[in-house]
Curated annotation (Swiss-Prot):
PROSITE patterns: G_ENGB (PS51706)
Function statement: Necessary for normal cell division and for the maintenance of normal septation.
Keyword Magnesium: yes
Family note: Belongs to the TRAFAC class TrmE-Era-EngA-EngB-Septin-like GTPase superfamily. EngB GTPase family.
Cofactor field: Mg(2+)
Protein's UniProt keywords contain Nucleotide-binding: yes
Annotated ranges, domain EngB-type G: 22-195
Keyword set, alphabetical order: Cell cycle, Cell division, GTP-binding, Magnesium, Metal-binding, Nucleotide-binding, Septation
GO molecular function ontology, one term from the record: GTP binding
Name of the protein this chain belongs to: Probable GTP-binding protein EngB
Length: 197
């Protein structure tokens, strides 16, 4: 999809701040610093629109990016970061859970995992939680440019096994540097949301 118009509409901390539109929404979840902002920037064809944070756990709001007046990307607070207090973690947890389970406009979730390593326990828990609620999920293994191309098949196997995913689980290898996988991610998003050029 060709993207020309993007706007960060709201950084929400509670439900009454969510955009009051019927546009389809697509949530991006993943551990802190897994590359959510980088993926967003590649998808919307901007350099630093979605702020790439040097401080893991910094995104503590649900950030709604309106794309082409057709859909929203919703950047969800990163999970699994130790320096965020337990109270803050619980608060995020509740907000994320409410959003993912009750938001009618939500059409699917893109879960990012670091393609250089096996998924963490947090990654697995998030994936299983999404599966439990039957939320359509695309797994994106990031930073694959840091892994030799001949190891890419192994990444797919390790990630699926680590998440406890079915063999036919949608999974895309992605690199923000080379843009590998970006087109396939867009294709999945378009299928889920019914949005296209």
């Amino acid at each position: 999809m060709q993207v020309h118009d993007v706007e960060l509409t709201i950084s929400a901390v509670e439900e009454n701040q969510y955009p009051a539109t019927a546009l389809p929404e697509l949530a991006l979840v993943g551990r802190s610093n897994v590359g959510k902002s980088s993926l967003t920037n590649v998808l919307i064809n901007r350099k630093n629109y979605a702020h790439t944070s040097g401080q893991p756990g910094k995104t503590q709001t649900l950030n709604f990016y309106e794309v082409e007046h057709k859909l929203y990307f919703v950047d969800v607070p990163g999970y699994g970061y130790a320096k965020v207090s337990k109270k803050q973690r619980e608060k995020f947890g509740k907000m994320i859970e409410n959003y993912l389970t009750t938001r009618e406009q939500l059409r699917g979730v893109v879960q990012l995992v670091d393609g250089r390593h096996a998924p963490t326990e947090d990654d697995r828990m998030m994936f299983q939680w999404l599966a439990y609620y039957h939320i359509p999920t695309l797994v994106v293994a990031t930073k694959v440019d840091k892994v030799k191309p001949n190891a890419h098949n192994r990444i797919v196997k390790v990630v699926k096994e680590g998440l406890g995913a079915a063999k036919d689980q949608d999974l895309i290898l992605f690199s923000a540097t080379t843009k590998k996988g970006a087109e396939s991610v867009w294709q999945w998003i378009e299928e889920r949301t019914g949005v296209s050029d």
